[in-house]
């Protein structure tokens, strides 16, 4: 099968990676192929159904593939690790999709590499299917994200903390896998020339219009800050908690990446944490905008030598970008909140209107997704909201203020903005448990609902229901390594 690889990272950035083969697997079996994505990439899904097990397990890579493990560093929970890198993944190449966009193809769970740091480099079935589900859920919501092209069972049992688990490999598609941590890897070694080469490559690949800017590296820093501010605002608007916002998990492209301990919040609480390793709540839902700025500061540090030869002027330029991050984020968040509330135009009091609703939701632990979805029904029937609030009077003072700001077509616009289906934690776990038992039908049904999150259907009612009371209080997510 022809993939038409054009591997610019391997060609242009020698010394930024290690050439490495995928580990052999005993009995690969294609579990699921993302046929719409395959077509988007210009690939033949029928042919991939037949040959995908061999290709996406790494046993028989297509002609032109160049498997490599990328080097990067990163701050993990605030502590700097100078060498991380692809410890269980291989970039096999780049292709151009039907829209003319360059896309990475990466095998995740393909075995040990020089960056594995003692781990086995493999992935278990549960984390692979989880990333497939949540990535497609984010795509359905219109949020920039890496996506899964395929999931392959390897036929190899893996020993994990919870016991023996079947092995699997995910084929991940991304605009690129360049991270803040990629810049940090070379900056930490004072290899300014490679930082410059990486910046030039990232500009050419993701922000080519900046190449002719008076100060292209400063413009690049601003562009990444803008892309990430918009991304995190969109996470917040749907109640998404990434769970591990380390700098090696922040992309230069502005795509969401790495869905290990992520989860969607149900009852609204800014302090919500699901990750089993986030013991201090560093990456709690409400902290994500602050971590956004913190991570961008680390990128700024790596770029300082490119911003100006004078250290003081370079710091001033970096700070001039950092000082805008809060306003960038708030602007995207408020624009999104106006859409979620169905407001007409923009007025000064809109932020307060939104914040007062959130405070009422917090005090009642109201379901994030259903509250905003049922607000569309409340345009004509305020009773639609009452089941979501323990205290029926919680919104009495707020509703008239909201009604005064509604657009004429508010209900229709709100239903197109506020999803009815998200990847609720209990439904994801049910689908994964069934998959472990050999039944992928629940996975498929959930995936179908998540692909159309704004379209409410009677036969998908179960996917809209919150978890049983108390479920999320004890629910914990894991990295899957």
From Swiss-Prot:
Ranges in coiled-coil conformation: none
Catalytic activity, reaction form: L-seryl-[protein] + ATP = 3-O-(5'-adenylyl)-L-seryl-[protein] + diphosphate; L-threonyl-[protein] + ATP = 3-O-(5'-adenylyl)-L-threonyl-[protein] + diphosphate; L-tyrosyl-[protein] + ATP = O-(5'-adenylyl)-L-tyrosyl-[protein] + diphosphate; L-histidyl-[protein] + UTP = N(tele)-(5'-uridylyl)-L-histidyl-[protein] + diphosphate
Entry's Gene Ontology molecular function annotations: AMPylase activity; ATP binding; magnesium ion binding
Residues the record marks as active site: 248
Enzyme class label: transferase
Listed cofactors: Mg(2+); Mn(2+)
Keyword Metal-binding: yes
NCBIfam families referenced in this protein's UniProt entry, alphabetically: PRK00029.1
Role this protein plays: Nucleotidyltransferase involved in the post-translational modification of proteins. It can catalyze the addition of adenosine monophosphate (AMP) or uridine monophosphate (UMP) to a protein, resulting in modifications known as AMPylation and UMPylation.
Family assignment from sequence similarity: Belongs to the SELO family.
Full protein name: Protein nucleotidyltransferase YdiU
Species annotation: Cereibacter sphaeroides (strain ATCC 17029 / ATH 2.4.9)
Gene, per the UniProt record: ydiU
């Amino acid at each position: 099968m022809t993939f038409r690889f054009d591997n610019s990272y391997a060609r242009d950035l020698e010394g930024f990676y290690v050439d490495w083969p995928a580990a052999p697997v005993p009995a690969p079996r294609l579990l699921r192929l993302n046929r719409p994505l395959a077509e988007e990439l210009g690939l033949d899904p029928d042919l991939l159904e037949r040959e995908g097990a061999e290709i996406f397990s790494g046993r028989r890579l297509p002609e032109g593939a160049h498997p490599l493990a990328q080097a990067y560093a990163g701050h993990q929970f605030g502590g700097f690790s100078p060498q991380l890198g692809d410890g269980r993944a291989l970039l096999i190449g780049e292709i151009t999709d039907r829209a003319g966009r360059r896309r990475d193809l990466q095998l995740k769970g393909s075995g040990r590499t020089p960056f594995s740091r003692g781990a086995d480099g493999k992935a278990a079935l549960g984390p692979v299917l989880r990333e497939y589900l949540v990535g497609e859920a984010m795509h359905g919501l219109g949020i920039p994200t890496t996506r899964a092209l395929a999931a392959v069972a390897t036929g190899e049992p893996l020993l994990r903390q919870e016991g023996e688990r079947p092995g699997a490999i995910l084929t991940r598609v991304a605009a690129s896998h360049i991270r803040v941590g990629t810049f940090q890897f070379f900056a930490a070694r004072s290899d300014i020339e490679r930082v410059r080469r990486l910046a030039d490559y990232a500009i050419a690949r993701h922000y080519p219009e900046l190449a002719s800017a008076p100060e292209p590296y400063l413009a690049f820093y601003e562009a990444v800050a803008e892309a990430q501010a918009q991304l995190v605002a969109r996470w917040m608007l749907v109640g998404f908690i990434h769970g591990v916002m380390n700098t090696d998990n922040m992309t230069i492209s502005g795509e969401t990446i790495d869905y290990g301990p992520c989860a969607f919040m149900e009852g609204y609480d800014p302090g919500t944490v699901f990750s089993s390793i986030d013991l201090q709540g560093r990456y709690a839902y409400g902290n994500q905008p602050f971590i956004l700025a913190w991570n961008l500061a680390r990128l700024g540090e790596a770029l300082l030598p490119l911003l100006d030869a004078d250290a003081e002027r370079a710091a001033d330029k970096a700070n001039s970008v950092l000082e805008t991050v809060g306003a960038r984020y708030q602007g995207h968040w408020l624009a999104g909140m106006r859409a979620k509330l169905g407001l007409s135009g923009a007025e000064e009091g809109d932020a307060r209107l939104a914040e007062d609703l959130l405070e009422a939701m917090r005090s009642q632990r109201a379901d994030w997704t259903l509250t905003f979805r049922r607000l569309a029904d409340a345009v004509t029937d305020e009773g639609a909201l009452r089941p979501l609030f323990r205290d029926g009077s919680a919104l009495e003072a707020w509703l008239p203020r909201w009604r005064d700001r509604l657009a004429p077509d508010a209900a229709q616009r709100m239903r197109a903005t506020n999803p009815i289906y998200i990847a609720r934690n209990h439904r994801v776990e049910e689908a994964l448990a069934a998959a472990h038992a050999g039944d992928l039908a629940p996975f498929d049904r959930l995936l179908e609902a998540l692909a159309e999150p704004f379209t409410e259907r009677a036969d998908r009612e179960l996917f809209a229901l919150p978890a049983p009371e108390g479920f999320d209080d004890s629910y914990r997510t894991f990295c899957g390594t």
